[in-house]
Amino acid sequence: MIKRLIAFLILLVCSVYGQTSEVVFIQMNDVYEIAPLEGGKYGGLARVKTVIDKVKQTNPYTYVILSGDFISPSALGTSTYEDKRINGRQIIDVLNAIGLDYVTFGNHEFDYKYEVLQDRINQSQFEWISSNVKRNDNGTTFPFNQNGIDLPEYKVLTVPGYLKNPPLKIGITGICIDANKQSYVSYADYYSSAKDVYSKLRDSINYFIAISHLVIDEDKKLASEVPQLKLIMGGHEHVNMYHRVGETVIAKADANAVTIYIHRLTFDENNKLLDLKSELVSINEKIAEDPKVKVLVDEWVTRAYKGFYDKGFDPLKMVIDLKKDTLDGKDETVRYTQCALGYLIGNAMFDAAKGVDLAFFNSGAIRIDDKLTGEITEYDIIRVLPFGGRIFKVELKGSLLKQIIETGFSQPGSGGYIQYYGLEQTAAGYKVKNELIDEEKVYSAAVADYLMSGMESNFGYLTKDNPGIVKITEPNPNDKDDLCNDVRFAVINFLEKWFIQNRK
C-alpha cells in the first residue's frame, strides 16, 4: 500500500512539473573590470563563470546577457599590449570565455573610434543586438556588422514545447541611450524602435523582452509605451534596482558584476507564462573562481601592468596607506554627493594648476565604483581615473561659473554631477574664497578637459566658444614635468606629498 502511494505521488509530481518549461536569463550590466574588486571580495568574471555553469547544469535553456557598457572605460583597457592600446580586448576575451550569449550597446561602447569598436565587435564570439543604433557614414545609415554580417534588430529564442506542443518563442531586442553621440553613430527613437520590432514579431513569438541601456525613467516609459514587454534587462545606473510597470519587470544589477540577476521564466504546456522570478545574486568570496577563466584574467592583468610601466606608472607602488580610513568611489556616492575622493581629486587639480581659485570636474571621470582602503597603489589611481585626461586652467565669468555649478548639482546620479575643491555652498549662495560668486567677476579654475568639450550630460554649452570663457590655458604636451598633462599623475603626486608630510 505504501509503495503504491509513493509511486502515485511520484507520478503526480512528474505530471505537474513535467508540463512546465523554464527559460533562464543571467543578466549583467556595466562591467568594466574582469578581476574582483575591494581587495578580491566582490565581482570577478571567473566567479560569474562558476555561477553560469551551475545554472546551466540544471537548465540548458539558460542565456547570458550583458546590457551594455563593457568595452570602455577600463583601467586595463587604457594600457598597451603588442605595441597597441588594449582598448577592451581584455574584456571581450574574458566574456568569450565565460560563455556570454547576447549584448546590446551601451553609451561607452562609443568612447572609441569606429575602427576600434568594429575590431571589438568582430572579436566577440557572442551576438550583438540593437534596434535603435545604426552606423552613420556621412549621413547614410545602416546596421553595424559583425565579421561582415549585419547586427540584427532582434533575435528569436526557440525552446522546445511540452511533448507535441509547438515550441516556445521569445523575441529579444536591444536599445541604447543616445548619451555619447559620435559622428559615426545614428540613434533612432527608443520607443518607436521597440514598437517597430514588436510589430514585426507579434505574430511569430509568444513573449517579448528587451536588453536596454537607458536611464530608469526611460526604461519605465519604454514599459508604458510597449506594454507587451515582459522583461527589460537594463543598465546604465550601476546600482541594482527592480521595478514593475504594469506587467513589465525592469531589473538592473550592480556594476562590475558585484551582483547579477538570474531571471527564471516558467511556462505551462500551452506556453503561457506562469511565473517570472528574479533573484539578485551577490558575486563574492564564497563563489569559487573558474580556474581557466582566472588564468586568462591573470594573463591580461600582467600584460596591462607591463604597459603601465612603459607609460611611467608603477602599478604596484604604494602611494599612500589609508590604514583603516576609506575613500568611497562607489557610483551611488560620487554621483550623488560631495565626497572625500572627489575633494581629493579636486585638491590635486588645484595644486597642479597653481594659482587658481577653485577646481571642479565631472563625477563620471571617477570609474572605479569601489571603495579604497589600506595601501593604495598607483594602479588604484588608474582604476579611479581610467580616462586620465588633462587639466585646463580656465578663466571664466562668475555668471558662467554659477551656471556650471547649478547644472552639475541639478543632475545627481549622472556623470555630469560635479565634484569640486575651493567652492562653498551656503544658504546665501555659492562662495569662492569666502565671498559670494560675483557674476561680473572673472575667476580662475582648474577644469577637467572632458568637461570643457561640451560632451558631458547637459553641459553642451561648456566649450571654448562660450562667451563666458575669457581664456583657456592648456598644458604643454612636451613638458613631461607638467602634472596637468595627466590628472592621474597629479593625484599620485599630491597623495605622495600628503603622505610624506603627515607621516612625520
Where are these regions (language model features)?
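Catalytic centers of hydrolytic enzymes
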Residues: 19-22, 33-36, 49-51, 57, ...
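General secondary-structure edge motif
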Residues: 5, 181, 245, 328-329, ...
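Hydrophobic h-region of N-terminal signal peptides that target proteins for export
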Residues: 10-18
